[in-house]
């Protein structure tokens, strides 16, 4: 049995070898495409194709690569731009050559700038010379006209130091302004209601007469124009509360607490400003949180009766604590002795400013006492 199988196997190998070394016979046929396909599909075609391939290949590597037709194509490189730029870039010069070229260029630029500067200065000098010549020519032509300069043959220049400045042109009925001393008050809306029109203002001659002698009692002297400037129809502003005035509330002494007394300020450094919760002082017009006075006059209104500690002491020589504990205390405006800028302006007097230091210099403890003494001296001289 085994011998039979060995014979069959040897026969198959022999048949394969015969097919392998069989020569390929070329055939030409004029059959149609269907017939040719049938002939290619026959058994002998596969064997002949295999035999043809075997004969053409001498080595195994050649047989492995046998297959469909391949065409070799050349594709462009990816970094063509970089390569081109590298090729086009010139070689870097050495450091010494770069420094030499840089220094040469700097020297050339400096030389060009110097030449430009020299040319500019020359052109400037030439232009100045031409302008002066043209100006002299024009002036000579102008001087040839008779009566043009009325005897003045020089160019208008700066005034001499010793020459006096001409007097300002004044208009009748209009007050002139003088610096640094200004004696004429500005015509404000509140003052225009009292003085009336501009025609009633003092003339310049009257003001010069007043300035001849020093006004020693300017702070206490009431302006003499108050009575003479007023017409029959002019009525000074009435002292009555307006529609927006806060109602006056009289607080009894029993309602004053110890905390309010401790909250009284003795100097201006202790003040705390608060525009929402603070109360306004009639003298300094500052809205602070410290305790103010309360006027016990039923005819008082608004904030007229509110004074802070420093203002009441320096201006009138009184204390806020004593005013709060006095049931009959009236504020300075109600007594007619208020020396704030608003009340003095309403009475026709100038504002005092910070007068407390001058009052203390003359030996007075407050501004009211100093003004009172000046008023007495003025009345005695009058």
Swiss-Prot record:
Interaction with MYC: region residues: 152-177
Compartments (UniProt record): Nucleus; Cytoplasm
Biased composition (Acidic residues): 105-117, 203-215
UniProt region (Disordered), positions on chain: 68-118, 151-217
Motif segment (Nuclear localization signal): 167-183
Any single Pfam family the record assigns to this protein: zf-4CXXC_R1
Chief place of localization: nucleus
Modified residues (Phosphoserine): 197, 225
Keyword Lyase assigned: no
Known partners and oligomeric status: Interacts with MYC (via C-terminus), YWHAE and YWHAZ.
Its job: Participates in MYC-mediated cell transformation and apoptosis; induces anchorage-independent growth and clonogenicity in lymphoblastoid cells. Insufficient to induce tumorigenicity when overexpressed but contributes to MYC-mediated tumorigenesis. May play a role as transcriptional regulator.
The protein's name: Cell division cycle-associated protein 7
UniProt source species: Mus musculus
Gene (name only): Cdca7
